[in-house]
Structure formats: C-alpha cells, structure tokens
Amino acid sequence: MDKEVNKSEVNNHPKIVRKKNLAEKIVIIDGQGGCGKTMLSPIIGAMDRVELLSYAFEVQWICILYKLNKIEKDAATSMVKMLIDHKLYQTMMGRDTNFRYSDLSSVFQNSNPWRYFKRIFQKGDLVIPD
C-alpha cells in the first residue's frame, strides 16, 4: 500500500525552479466548446514569431493535478515550462510536425507552411531555424 505523504514533508524538499526558457512568450487559447477558439487560432498563427497550433493536453493535465493539490506549484510551473520548451524545440527541428492536409494543427493551415518543409531537411540540432 502506498505511504501517504505528509504535506510538511513535501515542503522540506527543495523548490523546483527553471530559470531559462526557450519559449519566452507563449499564447494560450482556452475556452468553452463553441466559443471561437478554432476561428481565432489561424489568426494568431499568422502573426510574426508564432509557431504551429499545438494541442498541449499535458498542460491541462498538469494544471488539473495542481488544482487538486496533487503536485506543488513550483513543480507544476516547471513541468509546464519544460513541456512548452520541448514542444517548441521539436517544432523548430521539424519533429512531431503534422502534415495531414485537413487537420487544424497541420502545416497547411499555417500562413507559411514552407518553413516547416525546409526544417525537415536542415542539419538538425546544429542549426536553430528562424
């Protein structure tokens, strides 16, 4: 049987801090079903320095765990930052890129789909694309 963790024991552990981030500014589009998120996403995606639409369900799960007091705020914050940085890096390297033509998160729904085609042929980790 699992040992229940005393809240005071957890507070004695060092804080988790992530000082440097690859993603300096992020845009999160959230809301109830039918409120216009799908309409807003391509508009935001056409802006300068905005990458592909990404459904980051993991961020929702981390936030739910935090809200239910299952993880501490510093851990939740650091996990979200690491996840966002990982997703951005993978996109910049041409990995985990959606080329299904009709999907909302497809490169073909982006205002500049050719940059994603170029990325899959670049040298990889040695070159960070613009």
Language-model-detected regions and their locations in the chain:
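Detector for methionine-enriched segments
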Residues: 1, 39, 47, 79-82, ...
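Long, basic/Gly/Ser/Thr-rich N-terminal segments
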Residues: 1-8
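Pre-Walker A adenine-sensing motif
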Residues: 9-20
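Pre-Walker A (Motif I) flank of P-loop NTPase domains
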Residues: 23-26
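Hydrophobic anchor at the beta1->P-loop junction of P-loop NTPases
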Residues: 29
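A conserved segment at the C-terminal end of the G1
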Residues: 35-51
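PAPS-dependent sulfation machinery
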Residues: 56-130
